Structure formats: structure tokens, C-alpha cells
């Protein structure tokens, strides 16, 4: 998925030169993510999670291959990219609750934060590798990188094929414990909604995620920052994406040393507060070296906050509700990503990408302070071993 997002973002931005092109892509993705995520959580608690993951990954393989064929014949159009991105956003989000809920089945509770961190590290290793795959296959290393992205599309198709078969190598059963198929799907959905709303911690975590991400989403928008902040092209996109992922790996490794800290909600708040200050640094500087430093630190802070949020969701939710609880978490995150992608891309056309990040940093700090004092459940949460 990382490689697809880089390829399509660069393809769209090079075709139009407008941040709004990526902004509308974010809204299209958001429109399909909401229902897909909600029902993905319900089905993750009813169906075999391994099969559900493989089913959703098949769409990635098929549709990325479809774009590769169109690009090979110079027939790929903007509406094709929008349509395929919408479908793949829906299927990817539909499978997210199954992936998240499955994690808690294969590891003991006392090392769950380690497992979530390793998932994040695996994801970020891919995020490091894929920019360099893009760098090579898009010929960004040439003085004038204007070649077709057809090779990038085909390599992405090959990688997607392996994602279809990989879930079946996991030996643990994919079925949820205490599964209740007798209840209707809509009743399952309502039951999950009521559980999340009444939870003492989860609403605060979700509001925090939404409040910060809506004003600061920068991933998938590196073509804009590369051009506006550093006057660079594909090479800078690959560099910025990779170093942000390196930072995320450092952050995920740091999480492994926090397993003895009981007040995990405080870790989330501090990590998000640091994230806000780093956004200001990233937006303020036009030096790519300072930008790289800021992105490494941003990746680390974001990874700590994200991993701990996911861990708290898993620790405070019974297995037969995890699919729906993680779906609610994904809904908050993915919805914020879509709106944030639109907001940041549009604002970058009007006030500049740097000013947009500075504004986002100040708003993020304000959101953390509001959650700290107004929704104290997050701050007061302390993990207790069974």
C-alpha cells in the first residue's frame, strides 16, 4: 500500500501541479472508508480473520495490476486513479480491524505493546524500502525525472500478489473467541458503538487522534512539501518518505522499553505534544537537512503515540469486541487522515505548505492540552496485569 500511495500521489501531482488534486483524493478515500471500516469491524468479529485479510488484499493485487496495464498503454487517466484509490481504500480499511484484532490472539497480554510495536516496525520498514524502490523504478536518480511510472506500477503489482497469500502462513486460528453470529450485523454494529461510547478511555483517544491529524497530516503529501519547501522533485519525495519511516522505527523500538510504565495514556499525550512542536520546526525551515531531522523525530513521536493508542484499545477490550473497538479506532484515524489530507493540501495552495504545518503544530498542542484537562480518562489510565 505504501508504494501505491507514493506512486499515485506523484503521478497526480506531476500531471496537474495542484495540491488540490491530492486534496480531493483524500476526500474520495474518506467517503468510502467510513462504511467500510464500520462493517469491517463487525465482520472481523464474525468471520475468519485470516481469510478476510487475504480477500481484501486480492483487490489490491487486481486493481494495481489494472493501473499498471493502463499506464503501460499510456491510457491511465486521473479518474482511473481516483476510482482505484477509492476501491482500495475501502478494501484496505475493511481488513484493518481483522489485522489489528488478530494481533491480540497470537501474543500474551503482557507483551502486547511489543507486538503492536513490531507491527509498526514491520510497516515502517516497508515504508523505508518502498521509497527507494520508487526512486529506482521511477528513474528519479536521473537529472530530469520525467519518465513513465509504468515500472513502478508493475513492481507494486508483484508485491501485492505476495500480500494475498501471506496470511495463510499464520498457524493461529483466525476465528474470534466467543463469536456470536446469531446476532444480526446491524445489531453487532450498534452494540460496538454503544460499547465505545460508554468506554472511559477510548473516546478521548479517538478525539485526540482526530483533532491532531486533521490539521497536520503530511504523509502522502510529500510531493507538495518537496516542491514548495525544497524546490525538489521525485528524489526528495523518496528521501522524505524514507527518513520519516526511519523515525517511526526508532519510535516503535522506544515503545518496547515502556512496557513497565503503567500510565500508558500519559505516554500518548506526551508523544502527541512533542509531535505538535516538531510540526512547527518542519514547517518553519526550508533546509532539507532540518526537514529530514524534523521528519525523523515526527515519525518517532507519531509511532509512540500510535502504538500506545492501539495498545490501550487492545488491553481494555474483550476479544469478542476487539474487531469493533479497533474499527472505531481505525475510523477515527482514517477519517482524520482523509480530512487532514484534504485540509493540508488545500491550505498549502493558499498559505503555503510551511505555514500550514506551523498552524497545525499550534493547533495540535492546543488539542493535547484540552484532552489532558477535559477528558482525564486518558491521562489517568493505568494498566493492571491480570
Set out the residue ranges of the language-model regions:
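Transmembrane alpha-helix termini and helix-breaking/packing motifs in multi-pass membrane transporters
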Residues: 9-15, 68-73, 129-155, 228-229, ...
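C-terminal transmembrane bundle of multi-pass solute transporters/carriers
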Residues: 23-28, 35-39, 46, 50-52, ...
Amino acid at each position: 500500500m505504501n508504494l501505491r500511495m507514493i506512486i499515485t500521489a506523484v503521478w497526480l501531482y506531476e500531471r496537474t501541479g495542484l495540491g488540490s488534486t491530492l486534496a480531493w483524493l483524500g476526500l474520495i478515500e474518506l467517503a468510502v472508508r467510513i462504511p467500510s471500516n464500520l462493517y469491517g469491524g463487525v465482520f472481523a468479529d464474525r468471520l475468519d480473520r485470516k481469510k478476510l485479510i487475504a480477500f481484501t488484499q486480492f483487490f489490491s493485487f487486481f486493481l494495481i495490476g489494472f493501473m499498471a496495464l493502463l499506464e503501460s498503454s499510456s491510457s491511465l487517466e486521473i479518474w482511473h486513479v481516483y476510482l482505484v484509490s477509492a476501491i482500495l481504500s475501502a478494501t484496505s480499511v475493511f481488513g484493518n480491524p481483522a489485522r489489528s484484532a488478530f494481533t491480540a490472539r497470537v501474543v500474551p497480554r503482557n507483551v502486547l505493546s511489543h507486538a503492536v510495536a513490531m507491527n509498526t516496525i514491520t510497516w515502517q520498514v516497508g515504508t523505508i524500502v518502498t521509497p527507494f524502490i520508487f526512486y529506482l523504478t521511477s528513474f528519479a536518480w536521473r537529472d530530469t525525472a520525467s519518465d513513465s511510472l509504468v515500472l513502478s506500477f508493475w513492481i507494486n503489482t508483484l508485491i501485492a500478489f505476495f500480500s494475498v497469500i501471506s496470511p495463510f502462513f499464520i498457524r493461529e486460528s483466525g476465528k474470534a473467541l466467543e463469536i456470536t453470529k446469531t446476532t444480526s450485523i446491524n445489531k453487532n454494529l450498534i452494540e460496538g458503538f454503544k460499547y465505545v461510547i460508554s468506554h472511559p478511555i477510548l473516546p478521548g483517544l479517538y478525539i485526540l487522534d482526530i483533532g491532531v491529524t486533521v490539521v497536520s497530516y503530511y504523509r502522502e503529501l510529500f510531493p507538495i512539501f518537496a516542491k514548495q519547501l525544497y524546490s525538489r522533485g521525485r528524489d526528495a519525495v523518496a528521501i522524505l518518505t524514507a527518513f520519516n519511516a526511519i523515525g517511526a522505527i526508532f519510535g516503535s523500538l522506544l515503545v518496547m522499553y515502556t512496557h513497565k510504565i503503567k500510565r500508558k495514556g500519559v505516554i500518548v499525550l506526551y508523544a502527541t505534544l512533542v509531535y505538535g512542536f516538531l510540526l512547527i520546526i518542519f514547517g518553519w525551515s526550508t533546509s532539507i537537512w532540518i526537514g529530514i531531522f524534523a521528519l525523523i523525530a515526527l515519525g518517532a513521536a507519531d509511532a509512540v503515540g500510535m502504538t500506545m493508542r492501539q495498545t490501550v484499545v487492545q488491553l481494555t477490550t474483550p476479544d469478542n469486541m476487539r474487531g469493533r473497538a479497533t474499527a472505531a479506532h481505525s475510523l477515527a484515524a482514517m477519517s482524520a487522515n482523509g480530512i487532514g489530507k484534504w485540509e493540508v493540501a488545500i491550505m498549502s495552495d493558499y498559505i503555503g505548505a510551511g505555514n500550514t504545518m506551523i498552524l497545525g503544530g499550534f493547533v495540535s498542542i492546543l488539542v493535547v492540552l484540552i484532552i489532558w484537562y477535559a477528558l482525564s480518562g486518558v491521562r489517568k489510565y493505568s494498566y493492571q496485569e491480570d
